[in-house]
Amino acid sequence: MAKRDYYEVLGVNKSASKDEIKKAYRKLSKKYHPDINKEEGADEKFKEISEAYEVLSDENKRVNYDQFGHDGPQGGFGSQGFGGSDFGGFEDIFSSFFGGGSRQRDPNAPRKGDDLQYTMTITFEEAVFGTKKEISIKKDVTCHTCNGDGAKPGTSKKTCSYCNGAGRVSVEQNTILGRVRTEQVCPKCEGSGQEFEEPCPTCKGKGTENKTVKLEVTVPEGVDNEQQVRLAGEGSPGVNGGPHGDLYVVFRVKPSNTFERDGDDIYYNLDISFSQAALGDEIKIPTLKSNVVLTIPAGTQTGKQFRLKDKGVKNVHGYGYGDLFVNIKVVTPTKLNDRQKELLKEFAEINGENINEQSSNFKDRAKRFFKGE
C-alpha cells in the first residue's frame, strides 16, 4: 500500500511553518496516542503521524522529501529511513507529558555549595590606596553539633521508609494523554534512600546552621566601582561532602569631593582668574599623594586640559598608573570695584574696543532703562 503524503497526514499545506507542523502533530498525537485511543488502527495511525512529523520537522529531511518524495536519495523516509536516535523531535514533546528524560543526577554525589555575594561600600581613598576591612555576614555554616551529617550524634541513618531505599517513587499524574505513571525523587529522603533514626537537634537534619561570621577582606589598591574579589571557600557548605562555595565581595565606591575617576585616570577641575589666564601663573594643585605646582601658560583658555602623567590611580592588575587631567575654567569676575572697572576700560581702549558697559545690578539697569540709555 502506497504511503500517504506527509503533509496530508498532518493536515497542513506544503508552505506550513515549523510551528504549524508542530501544532498539527501535537493535536493528532493526542488524538491517536495508543494510551488514549483504543480503537483499532489507532496505533498504526500514530506511527504514521510520528513518521511524518519526524521528516517534516527536520529541515534537511523536509528538503529531500519535497524534492524526491518517499523515494529519497538515501533509501526513503520509511521505518528504515531513520534510527532510534533520530526520534529526539517528538521525544522532546512527550518529555513534558512523562516527567523528563532518562538521565538523572545522582542525589548522593558530592556537590559544591552555593556561591554568595556581599556588597561592601568603601571610600574613594580606600579604593585608590587599598585597605583591609572586617565584615560581618550571615550565612549557612556546617552544623557544629553533627558536623554536617544531619543525624543526632550517636545515632545512624536507616533505609527510607517512604521509598524503601530506592531514592525514587512512582506517582501517577493527570496529563493531556490521560493518567501517566512517572518516577520522581523521593520527597522524604530527597533521593538519598536513607533517613535519620533521629535528626540532629541543632540543625533539624539539614546539616547546616545559620550564623553571623566575621571575615577580613583585602581591598586591592586601585579597585574600581562594581569590581569584586573572591574569597574561596567562604560560601555555603557543600552537599554530600562536596566543597564549600565561594564568597564574592562587590565594591561600591563613594565619589570623591575633589576628583572624578574614569578607570585609572582621574580629573581635577581648576578655576583660574582672568588675570591668571592672560598673564600665566604657577598654581598649587592636589594630586592623590601630595600637592604639586602646575604652570599655567599666558593666554590659557577655558577648556584647556593639562595632563600629569602617572599621577592617576594604580592599575588594580599591576599595569602601571593612570594619569591626572586638569581641566581649566577661566572665571569671569562678577563684582568689580571702581578701580578694577577703570583698568578694564583702559585695557579695552588700548585694544580699540568700544565697550557699552552693562550693570549686573537690577536697580542700575532699571535706572538706565528709564533714562533711555
Swiss-Prot record:
PROSITE patterns referenced in this protein's UniProt entry, alphabetically: DNAJ_1, DNAJ_2, ZF_CR
Zinc recorded as keyword: yes
Top-rank lineage group of the source organism: Bacteria
Cofactor(s) for this UniProt protein: Zn(2+)
Signal peptide per UniProt: none
CR-type zinc finger locations on the chain: 130-212
Domain notes: The J domain is necessary and sufficient to stimulate DnaK ATPase activity. Zinc center 1 plays an important role in the autonomous, DnaK-independent chaperone activity of DnaJ. Zinc center 2 is essential for interaction with DnaK and for DnaJ activity.
Chain's role: Participates actively in the response to hyperosmotic and heat shock by preventing the aggregation of stress-denatured proteins and by disaggregating proteins, also in an autonomous, DnaK-independent fashion. Unfolded proteins bind initially to DnaJ; upon interaction with the DnaJ-bound protein, DnaK hydrolyzes its bound ATP, resulting in the formation of a stable complex. GrpE releases ADP from DnaK; ATP binding to DnaK triggers the release of the substrate protein, thus completing the reaction cycle.
The name this protein goes by in its record: Chaperone protein DnaJ
